[in-house]
Amino acid sequence: RQRQMCIRDSDMDATIFGDPAGQIPRMDTLSFPADEKLVKKAVAANEKANPDIHTFTGRVVSGDQFISDKDVKERISSLFHPMCVEMEGAGIAQAAYLNKVSYVIIRAISDKADNSATMDYPTFEKKAIAHSVRLMKELLPMI
């Protein structure tokens, strides 16, 4: 299922000032939309390079925490309705937005933050590296 790819900051809470959750004060936007052309190219490249894995697009939220607590996961899910939660994308997206630079965030998801992971992290890491290398070899010539 495809949705607009964008990044939001899950840690930012200036709601006491009337801002919505995730709004960075004095920013003129609530989220940082990724470049749609780059998203389409990344999806096409990944589907060709890694047909064995699923590709999803949509809202990504970033925060300065590993999500391992069920209540934190549910709070973030109910506030932001993300496809995934990670730690780095909002900083990259905000810098790209402020400098008017196109960007796309590509993530390999290791777990669902609910103790249901089916492989250990070292195994996941090796697979993610192999998938990432194949993806980049396919994507870079396209951009």
Predicted regions and their residues:
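Short, small-residue-biased leader/transition segments that mark boundaries at the very start
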Residues: 2-7
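Active-site rim beta-loop-alpha module in soluble metabolic enzymes
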Residues: 9-84, 95, 99
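Electropositive phosphate-/nucleotide-binding environments in soluble metabolic enzymes
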Residues: 32-40, 70, 86, 90, ...
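Alpha-helical scaffold segments in soluble metabolic enzymes
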Residues: 41-45, 75, 91, 131-138
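Active-site-adjacent mobile loop/cap segments within catalytic or ligand-binding domains
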Residues: 71, 75-86, 90-125
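His/Asp/Glu-rich mid-to-C-terminal helical/loop segments that flank catalytic regions of hydrolases
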Residues: 113-143
